């Protein structure tokens, strides 16, 4: 019996060549609408789907393949006698290949100002149904959803006279991944439309961006996946201009650096190691900001990731060139800057669009057996919630450094303490099990620079010992959430040393 293939694709890339090769191998081609027209125009013998169903396409093409003559031919078990008798009784011919890719829903909803009705019209019904039917019956039917697989199918047909079962099974798995991702994208789009934040079932889909050399450690395997419609302001959407592929740790650190530098409108530079900032600086120019970030901790920046929120010019590139860095992230690089930095073979240069609207996204953490989902911590300082709780108020300079330090400390692993002075971090205490321990680390790092500095804490002081440690180091102002049952002890201690202290009313734990 002559083998038959249904071909109906929105992505026409490679389809004419593939269809011609199938036809040359004796496969009868059945097609629909635009695909049929393209194939016929290129001389491919093709049968209209209506000639198989004996029913016209209706409802503007919404119904054309949803017919027993199609799905009976796809789902029949070939060595089941009853199935074969039923096919013969209803004059249904088996179908051996389904070559389908789906309406461009993703591309449609990515367009600016797309309407709901425009999006809905790009929800494919017949395509996924045929693909799923073929994939379910992959013991007998070859389902092809990816143009990248056309060559493999032809190669095996020529070599073996059939597509091997193991290949059909792999293609079936790809089909179900593809249709599941397609449905998940539609579900997410409509969920966003109706405003459900935490639905009873959460459908998420990601596309493999790259295989990674290894994971967090060399003995771990890893890959990097991105959202189909990832934010332009993201590491997933970053453009790499130079250097070898990003590693697992590179991606994590680059993401952390990008989130921190996004806190600032003024020129800002951030250096990150192991997802914690080792130096952050702001200034009137990006060169000044970077110099501050470097001086914050010139030891830890070695082998780190630097993110800048201004273009890298020749002067800035010369500074960066003198330091061993894994990655530099910026909105852009001048030609002169690229000429300087690309002399270093291993440095990765990334650009990210800083001008786009930064939409709030769910923050997802994988735990064994499930996911934790929360909204992003995008809270910024609100004058309405700031409260000076000490006898002395911060000076104008202290206010500037307090708000700077508060923007940084929310991105440091808890328990977190940040010391800042003159628009730069001078001490970072990260990831400690007690708060005074984090303060001591930050103070030790700051050294003599702690005199006249300010301190930011991501959570309240359970006791007054952190204020005591800060006072002994010469800190003059503190910003913290407040909310401890022993707040009064900390306030009294601050008053004792003439320290100005501000409560924000907002905690910034980060795990």
From Swiss-Prot:
What HAMAP family is this protein classified in?
A: PurH
> What are the protein's GO molecular function terms?
IMP cyclohydrolase activity; phosphoribosylaminoimidazolecarboxamide formyltransferase activity
Q: Where is the MGS-like domain?
A: 1-145
Q: Which reactions does this protein catalyse?
A: (6R)-10-formyltetrahydrofolate + 5-amino-1-(5-phospho-beta-D-ribosyl)imidazole-4-carboxamide = 5-formamido-1-(5-phospho-D-ribosyl)imidazole-4-carboxamide + (6S)-5,6,7,8-tetrahydrofolate; IMP + H2O = 5-formamido-1-(5-phospho-D-ribosyl)imidazole-4-carboxamide
The record's note on its domains: The IMP cyclohydrolase activity resides in the N-terminal region.
Q: Name one GO biological process term.
A: 'de novo' IMP biosynthetic process
Provide the protein name.
Answer: Bifunctional purine biosynthesis protein PurH
The answer, when asked if Cytoplasm is one of the entry's keywords, is: no
| UniProt xrefs under InterPro entries | AICAR_Tfase_dup_dom_sf (IPR024051), Cytidine_deaminase-like (IPR016193), MGS-like_dom (IPR011607), MGS-like_dom_sf (IPR036914), PurH-like (IPR002695)
Question: Which Gene3D superfamilies does UniProt cross-reference here?
Answer: 3.40.140.20, Methylglyoxal synthase-like domain
EC number(s) per entry: 2.1.2.3, 3.5.4.10
Query: What protein family is recorded?
Result: Belongs to the PurH family.
A family per Pfam: AICARFT_IMPCHas
């Amino acid at each position: 019996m002559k083998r038959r293939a249904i071909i109906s694709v929105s992505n026409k890339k490679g389809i004419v060549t593939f269809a011609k090769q199938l036809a040359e191998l004796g496969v009868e081609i059945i097609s629909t609408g635009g695909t049929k027209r393209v194939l016929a125009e290129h001389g491919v013998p093709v049968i209209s789907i209506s000639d198989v169903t004996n029913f016209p396409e209706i409802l503007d093409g919404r119904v054309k393949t949803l017919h027993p003559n199609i799905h009976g031919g796809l789902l029949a078990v070939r060595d089941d006698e009853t199935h074969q008798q039923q096919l013969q009784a209803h004059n249904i011919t088996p179908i051996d290949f389904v070559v389908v890719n789906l309406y461009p829903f993703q591309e449609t909803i990515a367009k600016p100002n797309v309407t709901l009705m425009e999006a809905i019209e790009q929800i494919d019904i017949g395509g996924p149904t045929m693909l799923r039917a073929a994939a379910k019956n992959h013991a007998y039917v070859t389902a092809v959803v990816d143009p990248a697989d056309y060559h493999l199918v032809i190669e095996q047909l020529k070599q073996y006279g059939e597509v091997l079962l193991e290949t059909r099974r792999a293609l079936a798995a790809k089909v179900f991944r593809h249709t599941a991702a397609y449905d998940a994208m539609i579900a997410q789009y409509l969920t966003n439309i109706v405003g459900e934040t935490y639905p009873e079932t959460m459908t998420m889909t990601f596309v493999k961006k790259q295989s990674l050399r290894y994971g967090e450690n060399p003995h771990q395997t890893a890959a990097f996946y991105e959202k189909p419609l990832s934010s332009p302001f993201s590491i997933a959407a970053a453009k790499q201009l130079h250097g070898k592929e990003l590693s697992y740790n590179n991606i994590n650190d680059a993401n952390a650096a990008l989130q921190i530098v996004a806190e600032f409108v003024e020129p800002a530079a951030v250096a990150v190691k192991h997802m914690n900032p080792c130096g952050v600086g702001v200034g009137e120019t990006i060169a000044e900001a970077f110099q501050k970030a470097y001086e914050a901790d010139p030891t830890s920046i070695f082998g780190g990731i630097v993110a800048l929120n201004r273009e890298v010019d020749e002067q800035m590139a010369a500074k960066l060139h003198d330091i061993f860095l894994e990655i530099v992230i910026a909105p852009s690089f001048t030609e002169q800057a690229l000429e300087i930095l690309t002399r270093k073979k291993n440095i990765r240069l990334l650009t990210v669009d800083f001008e786009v609207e930064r939409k709030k996204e769910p923050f997802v953490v994988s735990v064994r057996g499930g996911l934790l989902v929360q909204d992003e911590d995008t809270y910024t300082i609100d004058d309405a919630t700031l409260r000076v709780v000490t006898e002395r108020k911060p000076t104008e300079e202290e206010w500037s450094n307090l708000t700077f330090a508060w923007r940084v400390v929310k991105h440091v692993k808890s328990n977190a303490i940040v010391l800042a002075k003159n628009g730069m971090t001078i001490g970072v205490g990260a990831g400690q099990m007690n708060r005074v321990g984090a303060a001591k680390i930050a103070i030790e790092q700051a050294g003599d620079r702690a005199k006249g500095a300010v301190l930011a804490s991501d959570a309240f002081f359970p006791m007054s010992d952190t204020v005591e440690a800060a006072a002994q180091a010469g800190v003059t102002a503190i910003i913290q959430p407040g909310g401890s049952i022993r707040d009064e002890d900390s306030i009294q201690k601050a008053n004792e040393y003439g320290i100005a202290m501000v409560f924000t009313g907002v905690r910034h734990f980060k795990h």
